[in-house]
Amino acid sequence: MKKSAPVPIGIVGASGYGGVQLVKLLQNHPKVEVVYLGGDSSAGKPFSSIYPHLEHSVDLKIESIELDKIANKSQIVFLSLPNGLAWKMAPNLLEKGCKVLDLSADYRFSNLETYQSWYGGERTDQKIAATAVYGLPELYRDRIANAQLIGCPGCYVTASLLALSPLFKQGLIVPETAIIDAKSGTSGGGRKANINMLLAEADNSVGPYGVASHRHTPEIEQICSNLAGYDVKVQFTPHLMPMVRGILATVYGTLRDPGLVREDLLTIYNAFYRNCPWVKVLPSGTYPQTKWASGTNLCYLGIEVDHRTDRVIIMSAIDNLIKGQAGQSIQCMNLMMGWEETLGLPQLSFYP
């Protein structure tokens, strides 16, 4: 049987941490070939001059961002760019027949007014934005499979929603009691220079940021509201940890039925995620660690009930650059192309 030609892939914004994760993962994908890497400040440079450890496997130069050229070369385009840039490119690429996966916040919101109030800027792509599908496969697998434009979730959002979704979908917690305490490694801040990410600043220190104002908050609330059927507000506080990668989100909510026990919640979560190969619900009394998910597309969920306070506690661990970014976008691509959801994605972490 003749082997089919690989699907050509373009990556715009290849020089950042999200971009290099995409390149690395797609190099090992059996059905695609990366044919275009795009960037502005790095245009003309060999990709290996930015990431020398990939010199033996990636023989491409960073090219200037020219949409016609990208569309002519690529069937699928990943946009790994800062917020506010993808929406200026996606309509043109879609018009030329490309499938587009956006890793920024530009296409995550069903209401562009919400996007503008948190991210700023004007938008003139309302019609295109209305066609975007939210790229969390565990919730929207069928819609993703039929989409041309995907708005991939944020990293904190992915960890938080995978913990919260069964609670809101099943109406298990009292409205307005959801609290998310999340911790992330420094790679979540990207590759640009940032004083807070310097070793001397971040090492041996843990601190909150974006308190009561983090831009992932409305994204979490949007999906939780859709699941619950009413407007949901959550309390979300992220923290920076002295580690490179990983997110641990610990979610709290007051149970509507204080008679529920841990085994009840385990049954509910296992049923909710029974067809989700990338979500692992841990056995009773086992709680996740970020190291378990590092380098994989997995999400580990631990479950506990505190009968003293009538609260459920869900702990969610992911790799912020894989399940929280590049890996999840490839998971969406697999669904869009009718391939196995697990194709080309890592399942085993480096341990210890």
Swiss-Prot record:
Tagged with keyword Glycoprotein: no
GO molecular function, one term: NAD binding
Gene3D superfamilies, per the entry: Dihydrodipicolinate Reductase, domain 2, NAD(P)-binding Rossmann-like Domain
One Gene Ontology term from the biological process aspect of the record: L-arginine biosynthetic process
PROSITE patterns xrefs: ARGC
Keywords: Amino-acid biosynthesis, Arginine biosynthesis, Cytoplasm, NADP, Oxidoreductase
PANTHER family: N-ACETYL-GAMMA-GLUTAMYL-PHOSPHATE REDUCTASE, CHLOROPLASTIC-RELATED, N-ACETYL-GAMMA-GLUTAMYL-PHOSPHATE REDUCTASE, CHLOROPLASTIC-RELATED-RELATED
Protein name: N-acetyl-gamma-glutamyl-phosphate reductase
